[in-house]
Amino acid sequence: MGFKVETNGGDGSLVSAKVPPLANPLAEKPDEIASNISYHAQYTPHFSPFKFQLQQAYYATAESVRDRLIQQWNETYLHFHKVDPKQTYYLSMEFLQGRALTNAIGNLNIQDAYADALRKFGLELEEITEQEKDAALGNGGLGRLASCFLDSMATLNLPAWGYGLRYRYGLFKQIITKEGQEEVAEDWLEKFSPWEIVRHDVLYPIRFFGQVEVNPDGSRQWIGGEVIQALAYDVPIPGYQTKNTISLRLWEAKACADDFDLFLFNDGQLESASVLHSRAQQICSVLYPGDATEGGKLLRLKQQYFLCSASLQDIISRFKERRQGPWNWSEFPTKVAVQLNDTHPTLSIPELMRLLMDDEGLGWDEAWAVTSKTVAYTNHTVLPEALEKWSQPVMWKLLPRHMEIIEEIDRRFVALISKTRLDLEDEVSNMRILDNNLQKPVVRMANLCVVSSHTVNGVAQLHSDILKSELFASYVSIWPTKFQNKTNGITPRRWINFCSPELSRIITKWLKTDKWVTNLDLLTGLREFADNEDLQAEWLSAKRANKQRLAQYVLQVTGENIDPDSLFDIQVKRIHEYKRQLLNILGVIYRYKKLKEMSPEERKSTTARTVMIGGKAFATYTNAKRIVKLVDDVGSVVNSDPEVNSYLKVVFVPNYNVSVAEVLIPGSELSQHISTAGMEASGTSNMKFALNRVLIIGTLDGANVEIREEIGEENFFLFGATADEVPRLRKERENGLFKPDPRFEEAKKFIRSGVFGSYDYNPLLDSLEGNSGYGRGDYFLVGYDFPSYMDAQEKVDEAYRDKKRWLKMSILSTAGSGKFSSDRTIAQYAKEIWNIEECRVP
């Protein structure tokens, strides 16, 4: 092959052998694939020519896979251009892709051939895939959902694209020190990404600031300000065992050479010479920059508008390219569906109006008809702080033309209410888009989405019911058919087939087919074998292997030895008070205290447990960071306690991301989804755990409700208040009627005793005290749910001691997870919201 590889830090020298200057993108035989890898190592060089170590091998391997993807990608693009189907464009501020190599060769069904090819270099596929860094383009469930959706769109052969931003440093890389969480820049692009292709011919101008000029004919034009260029980077998204390969187009911000002032530079005014270049770099530097200052708010708003404007200019350009003029704009909604993933891309609405009116010459009514038939909105939260509201003065400063359009949409909506719904006059102030509060006038982005979109959907049945009965109830009375539910889903390719191959092989063996990978409903066939001893033995063996793999990972990243014979109990998600990691760790603290009080003989009768918690706390979210610190401090004490550490260990898993999840989820046995009822829109990690035969302890919140229905109530450890009880319980708390459980008080007192160190946890614990007030009054009902949570944990211990019962419950969990495929979700979006159809590449 021309290469000799050493993986133990040796020279890894290149040996002399001629490599033909020709690649075969469609190679499937190991010898041909190995030749392709050699070709890229020599003719697509990124490193010194006389070394071929693991990183070089990874990049050469990835580029050989990319060749094949580009071939399919081009065929897909040309086929879509020829057929000209209606196409969906999915706009999201986040795409949490994870590693691409395993996913690509898995979807292309060439993983075995690649494994054999790499062995010819003395390499294992797994050690090559470990070289890839996760693309830092997202943070949590919002971005991961978007990525699952892209996988399903491609697999279902749907004409669709994703649009996002190419963040240089992501959200942040999380480091855990004695001081708690520290944030450093994520360096995923330190070298480069072999999966993206820069499109130097796809460049759009994006204007900020400036003023609006009224032309003699009454038309309006946005002029002046500063103009940044949006440059496209394309990432191929292959479908599973299909030629269809769609695009995730990411935008990078850049300034032109003309914006560099050579005179100032040569005059020594170095920073002033490149002001616009610096501002352009800031736009895509990090995901969700801090917005405590006006500068931070402007930057976040710039990011959102940059995504919307670049994407819509690109969409319009493609519409024109396929229609080849003259263009009938009334046909635009029959060819284009724009889906807003939460409120971040809301500016797509006024931007599409602006482009149609100011650039294409449409009148208001025609532009509004096109826009309102094109755009649909997915709501992901009922949390007040997550329903975006932008300062009107900031909006006027940055986007003056858009504020004019938003004002007009608001004016017309208020007029509609006044004319047709006098019964809603008392509600108008809350329903309208503009909140003109003199102290703090804002634009309500969710309201703008609801008024302007043809469809609004929630992401779990409970969440959608809350949207219709509470958050958007007044709108429902005007547009009852506008609101839908689309329960979220996950891609079974990444989340079981690739991340847990042992389990996948067992499922295929017992179902006698592998078609479940694209038809997850077939998993119900496992139910008849739930009591089968042979299946249970195989099930247990595969779980054991995954637990050992997880234990090795934890040792590698934390230095902590954990026992694979203990119950692996995991909660991994963004750190937030409503997700109640605090409830989890308080339960752990109470368990630790009780273990300390037991005799050695009594401890032997308990269920040994390893509790793992992971997730990032936003840098400015103080209480969330205190929770991270508390978990780590508890772990330091518990894990070094020789009396207890054989029965309980606590680990904070740092820098949680997709690749970490692919190790944690298959190795888990119990998963905690314990948010305050009514506050989690859906959640998708619960689906990933349930699919991977992990039992759930949780509240009746989000998708937990539907998971429990599907897998069977007896296979779900339920606790806590229900969503309809929460308002009453908060009111009772305000009125001083809450009486805390003694166990809850005991756990808090134990923290305050200083046993976990000298850090001041009083501000965190104070949030659980009192009856009302900012940062007090236990808004998330940790104290109320604590006793039922502890009771449910006792039931977990009891069930785990009965191995046959636990295995049966585990099998039934996987068997009941068929509903939660993103293929099902996307098929429903395609039929019921987007009105698009399959467009398979022949």
From Swiss-Prot:
GO terms for cellular component: cytoplasm. The keyword Cytoplasm applies. Its main location: cytoplasm. Transmembrane segments: none annotated. PROSITE patterns: PHOSPHORYLASE (PS00102). The keyword Transferase applies. SUPFAM superfamilies: UDP-Glycosyltransferase/glycogen phosphorylase (SSF53756). It comes from the Eukaryota. Disulfide bonds: none annotated. InterPro entries: Glycg_phsphrylas (IPR011833), Glyco_trans_35 (IPR000811), Pyridoxal_P_attach_site (IPR035090). It is an enzyme of class 2 (transferase). Pfam families: Phosphorylase. Its cofactor is pyridoxal 5'-phosphate. The modification N6-(pyridoxal phosphate)lysine is found at residue 688. It is found in: Cytoplasm. It catalyses: [(1->4)-alpha-D-glucosyl](n) + phosphate = [(1->4)-alpha-D-glucosyl](n-1) + alpha-D-glucose 1-phosphate. One of its GO terms (biological process) is glycogen catabolic process. GO terms for molecular function: glycogen phosphorylase activity; pyridoxal phosphate binding. Keywords: Allosteric enzyme, Carbohydrate metabolism, Cytoplasm, Glycosyltransferase, Pyridoxal phosphate, Transferase. Its EC number is 2.4.1.1. Belongs to the glycogen phosphorylase family. Phosphorylase is an important allosteric enzyme in carbohydrate metabolism. Enzymes from different sources differ in their regulatory mechanisms and in their natural substrates. However, all known phosphorylases share catalytic and structural properties. The H isoform exhibits higher affinity for branched polyglucans such as soluble starch or glycogen. This is Alpha-glucan phosphorylase, H isozyme.
